[in-house]
Amino acid sequence: MRLKLIPKNEQELSKLFVLIFPLTLLLASLTSFLKDAYFTFANLIPNNKIFNYGFLDTLHYQATYGVLFATCICLSFTYLFSKSLGRIAILFPILFLTLLGLVGTEFLDLVLSFFYQDRINVVGNSSLLIILKLLVGFGLFSLASLNLLAKREASIFVSAQFIYGAIVFYFISLLISRSELVVFTDSLMIKSLHTSMYIYVCVSFVFLSIVHFLMTKPLGATLFNKTLTAITFWGFLFLLPWTNFKYYFGSVIPNWLENVSIYLSLSLLVPLLAFAVNYVKTIQTKEDEGNKSSSLMSFSVIIFLITNLLHIISSFENILPIVGLTNFQNVINQGYIGSLIFASISFVYYLIPKVFGRLVKYSRLEDLVFSGLKFMYPVLLINNFLIGVNSGYSWNAGANAGSPTIYGEGFSLSLIHI
């Protein structure tokens, strides 16, 4: 296996991110294990600047939604974007440095969190690091726009459309979090909007770009309907950025904004149905059964559909007060990032023979790993779901009795804003 220090094209660059992806996935899994292990054995472990749940939770967030997600963007952009445009990437050396900078700044953010815990921000630990992220984000947005304008195909494949949308919202999410806000309400609103744009939109769009490729090219299938794809793209584009405000129901966020968030969340059913129908009809035209990793792609779609259904159902009037400001928010976040992770694993298994020129020999180990992932991740989501609903009931029961209970309201506020 040869890995050039300075790649000359997208295929050589894809090798780099195919190798980086398992490492970042392992890093995210390790931080998740440390966080949950500390929560379980907190009474046996000393409490200091490193071993405390707030810091470990932030560390896990930066490893998962920072480093791992940046790697997924780079992996999908490197292989899918230019192929969808029908040409090689222009200004490739600058693009190579920009993609490395994207992963590098996120990893630097992770490292600096050990030294500047009192300056942790939503998107960075210091003003200089946030500026670096903005520069990298602007560079990636500019290069993607230039390549889009220089396309050779009359109509681009939908993967490029979703990737470009993810890059645009990634850059916007950095811009809106740049301001230092003193008023708590403003800070809470910006944090909520950042979550919607960064996790809901960006993660979903990278996932959709990978799935639309995996359900067509590797399986020899034909995309069922481009109109349904357009409904999926524009529906999620306009609706998802405003759907996180509802989870702060009853807090300091204005009531009109909460109501708008509720109505738009219910409207997610339209693009979700468009995607589900398009996926099912497209899969029915497949000519190849694919390899064993294709099952992870199908499983990722199931996780994505369930996550959005929970996101929609939580908007009902009798349910929202129970799930708002509880651990239920983690179910939505983990559902979106989990669907992307499973799709990316399947994508990496597809790329290995393409970029390295060697077949993947599946063994019982792969069967065991795939089965373990399919079993454990739903258990994780169900666990967070039950914790969130239980704490919501406890909070409402205590509030109605005149004695507010722990955990319910205030979740996700103290660790981030105080």
Regions found by a protein language model. Give the residues of each.
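Core segments of alpha-helical transmembrane spans in multipass integral membrane proteins
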Residues: 60-75, 200, 334-348, 375
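Structural signature of hydrophobic alpha-helical transmembrane segments
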Residues: 65, 196-204, 262-268
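Catalytic cores of extracellular degradative/oxidative enzymes
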Residues: 166-170, 199, 210, 214
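Juxtamembrane membrane-water interface segments of multi-pass membrane proteins
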Residues: 2-16, 34-57, 72-95, 111-122, ...
